[in-house]
Amino acid sequence: MTNIRKSHPLFQNLNDSLIDLPAPSSISSWWNFGSLLGICLAIQILTGLFLAMHYTSDTTTAFQSVTHICRDVNYGWILRYLHANGASMFFICLFLHVGRGLYYGSYIYKETWNVGVILLFAVMATAFMGYVLPWGQMSFWGATVITNLLSAIPYIGTNLVKWIWGGFSVDKATLTRFFAFHFVLPFIISALFLVHLLFLHETGWNNPTGIPSDSDMIPFDPYYTIKDMLGALAMVLALLMVVLFSPDVLGDPDNYIPANPLNTPPHIKPEWYFLFAYAILRSIPNKLGGVLALVLSILILILMPLLHTSKQRSMMFRPLSQCMFWLLVADLLTLTWIGGQPVEHPFIIIGQLASILYFLLILVLMPITSIVENHLLKW
């Protein structure tokens, strides 16, 4: 008799995706982050669901409802901090996942890559709207500044901003709709996640060498289930360390001050995971130019398959391209640091140079380096 997991229509897909899935024998720990992102999403949906039971999306009570969750609800404090720091863990895994894709040439699978870029945008939108919900000073002013950027769109900009706000400023209508979108978007992300997996299983997995591994496959279970469980254990341990020992280390102290439209904080900045894009936005003196650069800093990932000029897929055997890749990583870390600094000398010029280098590396230097390597290898 056939095993039920192989014959039952409900379990068949799960079996083909998680148990009998053929996987390359050479994939390293850099391939763990896909499963970690799935776990992060599950943590965020579960903690978010329980937080939503106690949260009120009204400007007069939102801040108090978050305080109530932390003080009066049973284990409300751990739910709140798991959710807030879980978002940071989500983005750490996300950036490492994208970085691995860039390093090992995973973007050659165009459909999987493009769905991944859409997922990145969806997660960023969800995180931004979630940051507005506690209705602290940084929530309010962050929402005001970022939504105001849409007014840079010619002709329709001003009306578009008022339409998103639901009035003439960020107020009750804005908070209510942001809560609604923040609640529904994770489920849309879950659907996109399944589409991402669907395309991945159509093509099969890449591996560190970038060479097709059809002749050397092993079943996903037990080898990679154990490996993923170890990664998940390490991630949950790191998350709990932050939540239980220093839950506010990644937050902004200004967000413990209730939102006040009459008092602007001295330095408005988003959460740490948006700082690199925020630094690029600020480095351009023109409003529309800054907004375009902000969008392109993420959208540029769509162009990666077109910018791939190397005859090899992976960077594993390409030392010059590796130098360029790590220069890009260093540049992004510099941008993250600059995004958290005030707009004054010397941070302005450092941010501008780092922004130019970011686009220069991706659009010019990395493709040229790949062509040089092809010639050096006489390909």
Swiss-Prot record:
Q: Which CDD domains match?
A: cytochrome_b_C, Cytochrome_b_N
Superkingdom of source: Eukaryota
Q: How does it sit in the membrane?
A: Multi-pass membrane protein
Q: What is this protein called?
A: Cytochrome b
Q: Which organism is it from?
A: Pteropus speciosus (Philippine gray flying fox)
Residues binding a ubiquinone are 201
Similarity section:
Belongs to the cytochrome b family.
Output the lineage of the source organism. Eukaryota, Metazoa, Chordata, Craniata, Vertebrata
Q: Which gene encodes it?
A: MT-CYB
Compartment list: Mitochondrion inner membrane
Q: What does this protein do?
A: Component of the ubiquinol-cytochrome c reductase complex (complex III or cytochrome b-c1 complex) that is part of the mitochondrial respiratory chain. The b-c1 complex mediates electron transfer from ubiquinol to cytochrome c. Contributes to the generation of a proton gradient across the mitochondrial membrane that is then used for ATP synthesis.
Q: Name one GO biological process term.
A: mitochondrial electron transport, ubiquinol to cytochrome c
The transmembrane segments are 33-53, 77-98, 113-133, 178-198, 226-246, 288-308, 320-340, 347-367
> Required cofactors, per record?
heme b
